[in-house]
């Protein structure tokens, strides 16, 4: 549906998959190491469901992350520079109902607007240093670029193709 609405070329997802694997290859602890992956390799991987190919999906895995959250007084005593939480928001919506917007879910747009307002963010592309966005399938990247306000509707794929989300290409919003 995203491809139809945005007129995005079929190889956007392939480019995301290659970029994500190359990013992972820079981390020696990443469980998937494919430093020599190519666009052709992704394009030749078997089709899961059109247009998603096997190498355009994330591998099944379990992971964990931990954060130490403290009051300002304790954070000031930390030997390392703290990262400040300026806003917190959460939204959810049923995954299936008639008329649900699947390309840009309302819950995502509302949640982003809420947390940006709390944190005083007016331009997420310029105001944020990092975003940890779950992209289980390659086509989610351009969709979430739009849904979270990094790009206007129908133009997230252009940021991907320009290299804006690539560390290797010097992108300004590397995911």
PLM regions with names:
Residues 3-9, 112-127:
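Phosphate/pyrophosphate-binding loops at sites that engage ATP/ADP/AMP, CoA/4′-phosphopantetheine
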Residues 11-16, 47-114, 162-175:
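Condensing-enzyme catalytic core mediating Claisen C-C bond formation in acyl metabolism
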Residues 97-101, 135-158:
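Short glycine/threonine-rich loop-to-helix capping motif typified by GTGT followed
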Residues 1-51:
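Glycine-rich, mobile lid/loop segments that gate access to catalytic sites or pores
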Residues 128-133:
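Short glycine-rich phosphate-binding loop at a beta-alpha junction
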Residues 66, 107, 111-120, 140-148:
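Stable alpha-helical structural segments in soluble proteins, enriched in small hydrophobic residues
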Residues 17-31, 92-98, 136-141:
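Acyl-CoA/ACP chain-elongation machinery
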Residues 75-77, 119-124, 151:
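Secondary-structure transition/capping motifs at alpha-helix termini
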């Amino acid at each position: 549906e995203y491809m139809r609405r945005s007129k995005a070329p079929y190889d956007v997802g392939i480019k995301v998959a290659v970029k994500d694997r190359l990013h992972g290859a820079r981390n020696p602890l990443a469980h998937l190491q494919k430093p020599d992956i190519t666009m052709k390799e992704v394009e030749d991987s078997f089709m899961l469901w059109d247009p998603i190919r096997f190498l355009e999906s994330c591998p099944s895995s379990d992971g964990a992350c931990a954060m130490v959250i403290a009051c300002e007084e304790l954070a000031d005593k930390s030997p390392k520079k703290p990262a400040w939480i300026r806003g917190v928001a959460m939204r959810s919506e049923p995954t299936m109902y008639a008329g649900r917007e699947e390309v840009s879910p309302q819950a995502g747009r509302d949640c982003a607007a809420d947390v940006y307002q709390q944190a005083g963010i007016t331009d997420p592309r310029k105001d944020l240093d990092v975003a940890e966005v779950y992209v289980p399938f390659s086509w989610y990247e351009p969709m979430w670029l739009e849904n979270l306000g990094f790009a206007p509707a129908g133009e997230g794929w252009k940021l991907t193709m320009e290299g804006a989300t690539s560390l290797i290409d010097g992108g300004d919003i590397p995911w």
